[in-house]
């Protein structure tokens, strides 16, 4: 009893009902039509081959769809890369132009730019108010003579 067989060890981990089911191999099921086990095996083999062919067809269809998607994405990537290159070249040209304009003094063109008028200091303006002509010693009216001085 010290030595157990491998099948005994395997059966210990299983239910007793399952162990009995495995111990008794069942004969190949005969179909109801009275076919022999050989014809049943041939039929199941044909069914399996048909199923394999269907799955291979589905695999080929999916592979073709994936390849088409990869090709579309590849062309889109190339297009985006070309556009990015064009934008980078245009950006470089604009940067060079801006740097060139910063380094060179602006050329003065007459009538090209608006020149604001120069500021001049504001001088006070005097307005001359006309006065009636009067002789020096004569009062104009009696009302003009100050009465408080008399």
Swiss-Prot record:
It is found in: Carboxysome. Residues 140-150 have a biased composition (Polar residues). Residues 115-124 have a biased composition (Low complexity). Its main location: other. Residues 1-14 have a biased composition (Basic and acidic residues). The keyword Iron-sulfur does not apply. One of its GO terms (biological process) is carbon fixation. The keyword Transcription regulation does not apply. Homohexamerizes, interacts with McdA:DNA, interacts with shell components of the carboxysome. McdA and McdB together mediate carboxysome (Cb) spacing, size, ultrastructure and probably inheritance in the cell, together they prevent Cb aggregation in the cell. McdA is an ATPase that forms dynamic gradients on the nucleoid in response to adapter protein McdB, which associates with carboxysomes. The interplay between McdA gradients on the nucleoid and McdB-bound carboxysomes result in the equal spacing of Cbs along the cell length. Stimulates the ATPase activity of McdA, causing McdA to be released from DNA. A type 2 McdB protein. This is Maintenance of carboxysome distribution protein B.
């Amino acid at each position: 009893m010290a030595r157990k067989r491998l099948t005994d060890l395997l059966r210990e981990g299983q239910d007793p009902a399952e162990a009995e089911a495995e111990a008794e191999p069942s004969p190949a099921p005969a179909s109801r039509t009275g076919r022999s086990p050989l014809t049943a095996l041939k039929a199941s083999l044909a069914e399996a081959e048909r199923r394999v062919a269907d799955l291979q067809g589905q695999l080929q269809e999916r592979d073709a769809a994936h390849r088409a998607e990869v090709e579309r994405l590849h062309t889109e990537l190339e297009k985006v890369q070309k556009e990015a290159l064009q934008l980078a070249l245009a950006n470089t040209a604009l940067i060079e132009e801006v740097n060139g304009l910063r380094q060179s003094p602006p050329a003065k063109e007459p009538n090209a730019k608006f020149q604001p008028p120069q500021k001049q200091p504001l001088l006070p303006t005097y307005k001359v108010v006309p006065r009636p002509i009067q002789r020096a010693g004569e009062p104009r009216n009696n009302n003009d003579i100050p009465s408080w001085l008399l």
